[in-house]
């Protein structure tokens, strides 16, 4: 799966490297998968197989390194990620808590491996953890490296809220305690900065907004054939929380009033094994509505396929059923001049207000989405204006360069405010 957080972190690291900084992007759990040039290191720390074994069998918490290398190898981890295993938050409660306990958790050996490696590296000026679920590392890293610790925030609440009790409460308590070792949090949207400040009980002064940015190589504006079908698109992970079922319902309502003109609904994105039945059900619903021939799932796409897919759309919508904190898919669609219709929740309003690249409607309202599609279908001038505004807005505010500039300022401020700590 192309993970949105991995895409963001890899794009940021690549841009910082291009700007002359020394950057080490270290994979955790599994090798980084991105549809751009991968700048992450080859060695994976906290290999997913080791973490799992150490969680469930005490023997593996004490095995020597030469044995660990067998299941920490890249080939073994890649093989494991290809297995069709359901990975849902409820089944990961104990593991999440253990990881957040840091050196008191079952993965203490893995922390030792990471610290041993870091001691041999040139001294870092700052360390940035990719998400709050790794905050069990904050105190050990600060103690050993004597440098400021930052933590990106990019969607942890959805995972945490999906944990069964007592794991959710235990995890939140551990994150809140570990936050004392963090010098700055980097939420990827203003919405998420405000929300996570309250959710985690972290002072607003520790929140530093670090907007998303994308690498625009290859993102040229679409050239649509007006004689073809009006194409509504969905580009995100195929799962209930991303709202494909909401979009299918909206499309059916849209087609109820536009049967005289050709149209289609295209979807693309990663489909996890546990959500195959979800997609099958949606396909069946479209068939019952007499629209099966207009609905197509294109699968998971590489970078070239993704850009070509987006360029084939007249409008894109990902009506997420939760408050999405990122919305990289919006930036990618707008970058090729495709207008979007989105629910007014999460980070969507601030992205559209800043770019002007789409229409906001009430959340969980299929009729409102359908009306947005009809508005764009009936008014080609409006569709073109929104598409042009979105493309310009992304280039003005949401490039990898803009993201790197902001993060540079945050890092510099954190280093400047942090008094030098004595080294061991």
Functional labels for PLM-detected ranges:
Residues 25-116:
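A conserved catalytic-core segment of Leloir-type glycosyltransferases
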Residues 191, 213:
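Carbohydrate-associated surface elements
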Residues 225-242, 248-252, 266:
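Conserved donor-binding/catalytic core segment of Leloir-type glycosyltransferases
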Residues 264-283:
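Glycosyltransferase donor-sugar binding loop
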Residues 279-304:
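Nucleotide-activated donor-binding/catalytic signature segment of Leloir-type glycosyltransferases, i.e.
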Residues 339-342:
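Short hydrophobic beta-strand element within catalytic cores of glycosyltransferases
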Residues 354, 359-366, 375-380:
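Conserved acidic donor-binding segment of nucleotide-sugar-dependent glycosyltransferases
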Residues 368, 375, 382-397, 403-409:
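A short, well-ordered alpha-helix in the C-terminal region of glycosyltransferases
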